[in-house]
Amino acid sequence: MRKIRTKICGITTPEDASAAVAAGADAVGLVFFQGSSRAVDIARAKKITAALPPFVSVVALFVNESAQNIRRILAEVPIHIIQFHGDEDDTFCRQFDRPYIKAIRVQTASDIRNAADRFPDAQALLFDAYHPSEYGGTGHRFDWTLLAEYSGKPWVLAGGLTPENVGEAVRITGAEAVDVSGGVEASKGKKDPAKVAAFIATANRLSR
């Protein structure tokens, strides 16, 4: 039996974190990119993580952040995995003594094909929609058929996912992990518990 892993990203409150966990999320994402409407600071991140039970992974999302600031956050917030969404290379990403996931903004099949060679130390790759000026969380999707035959490094599907289309996305791509943010929101930075529950329930139905 395969389990479709789910991450709810862009969590901004302890209440939203608790709702995600209650619905069955495997991981929650905290955005430390101040250019995002879903950004959190250290104080808020500590409140969110304090509300989580054991065995739920906390993922910190960074975009072209300095190594100094990343280390400062890691020293104060219990982070299990780092997710890099900017222009970071493998040498930069691997230096923080945490497993890391690298987001790949997909335009063509070559973006997918070359990703594993570019980031050999990544625990996984996250395939997201390309946007010329935004780094994730855009609500846009890419051509899922580009992933239909992919069999490289472990990977996560993101980009424009919703409770309504995640089933189709998994069937087309064969994804075993999915990441959603805007697709389960009531408004920017505020999750809709019903949408979160519906998204995870659909993923769970495919876990068989």
Curated annotation (Swiss-Prot):
Q: Tell me yes or no: is Isomerase among this UniProt entry's keywords.
A: yes
Q: Which InterPro entries match?
A: Aldolase_TIM, PRAI_dom, RibuloseP-bd_barrel, TrpF_fam
Query: Could you tell me the Gene Ontology terms of the biological process aspect for this record?
Result: L-tryptophan biosynthetic process
Return the CDD domains for the record.
PRAI (cd00405)
Pathway(s) this gene product operates in, as recorded in its UniProt entry: Amino-acid biosynthesis; L-tryptophan biosynthesis; L-tryptophan from chorismate: step 3/5
Which SUPFAM superfamilies does this entry report, sorted A to Z?
Ribulose-phoshate binding barrel
| Molecular-function annotations in GO | phosphoribosylanthranilate isomerase activity
- Which Gene3D superfamilies does this UniProt record tie to the protein? Aldolase class I (3.20.20.70)
User: Per the record, a Pfam family?
Assistant: PRAI
Name the Enzyme Commission number(s) assigned to this protein.
Answer: 5.3.1.24
Instruction: Report keywords, A-Z.
Output: Amino-acid biosynthesis, Aromatic amino acid biosynthesis, Isomerase, Tryptophan biosynthesis
Q: Quote the catalytic activity from the record.
A: N-(5-phospho-beta-D-ribosyl)anthranilate = 1-(2-carboxyphenylamino)-1-deoxy-D-ribulose 5-phosphate
The cross-references to NCBIfam families, in alphabetical order and at most eight, read: PRK01222.1-4
Question: Family per UniProt?
Answer: Belongs to the TrpF family.
Spell out the protein name for this chain: N-(5'-phosphoribosyl)anthranilate isomerase
